Amino acid sequence: MKEISKKNFDGYKYVDGGVCAAKGFKANGLYCGIKENPTKKPDLCLVESDVMCSAAGVFTQNKVKGAPVTVSQKNLAKTGGKAKGFILNSKNANTCNADGEEKAYKMCEMTAAKMGVKPEEILIAQTGVIGQILPLEPIEAKIDELYEGLSYEGNEKAAIAIMTTDTVKKEVAVEFELDGKICHVGGMGKGSGMIHPNMATTLNVITTDCAVSSEMLKKALTEIVKITYNCLSVDGDQSTNDTCAVMANGLAGNPEITAEGESYEVFKKALYIVMMNITKMLAKDGEGATKLLECTVTGAKDLDTAIIVAKSVICSPLFKCAMFGADANWGRILCAVGYAEADFDINKVDVSLSSKAGEIHVCHNGAGIEFS
């Protein structure tokens, strides 16, 4: 089973619907032919809001960027953070291709024509094999069917269409109250291999019916990515196409969030809940993974130090081997902590290992503790 245990948060309720949980969002996914026959697994999807959205995105910091990353970044810059729709495909990353940007923009044009908006008001993400020429013909042949099939219940089709080596779809949504209005944040993600985001192959689409300005949306997304997707690692390889974008259409009717404050914190927590759960789903479904490993650091001098230490541990191949073999070899944890670029006092380091079976304290103040 690849399901994760979702932690409950006061004031937030998990609901069905993924990217369609928020009011006014439709989605669809279908097979257009990018993936070879005879699989006919969905390989193209579309998410649309009934109205124009505030939008923000964070993208790979790999110097080799996929064409869709460049196009989405340019589109967000041109519009000042606005988007009406998001088109995505799997199987082909459209990366390291001479005509990659031209084709990615063409897909935005095709989508925009159906929605009656400008091409720069469309976001795009692509995932799959790097260096293969992207065939536009299958997409052009199916764009009408894709658009006409948009549905307020189409979230599952969309989530399946972005899968590559994933074995399960990944989506989550929450409902909460904000300034007297019922609001939603929902999302979908994909990724099993080439997972070591630094933004944040992984693609993520987040939708919300909250009214949030583009500036505050980007601020919230950047803050939450730092403690979710950027703390994720499966194989240590940073993708060329990592994309996480959020669209906010304001149809919940709350006063627009334009500055930090209580309303911003309520929204940001909802965003955190959705993104943290998707992060765990991505790790759980990592290629070859048999266990989900989490590292919690307490007592660090600041958040950055805690993140550096935790990521050093979860990225350690020897630590992963120990956990695979259910071997409480805590020395490998201290080894990984030791080579992390963080300041700490070894004489104040404690280590505990926990699982569903229980918890054992294996190291206190930098020294081992007898355990069995």
Each language-model region and where it sits:
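A structural signal for small-residue-enriched, beta-sheet-centric alpha/beta enzyme cores
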Residues: K2-S372
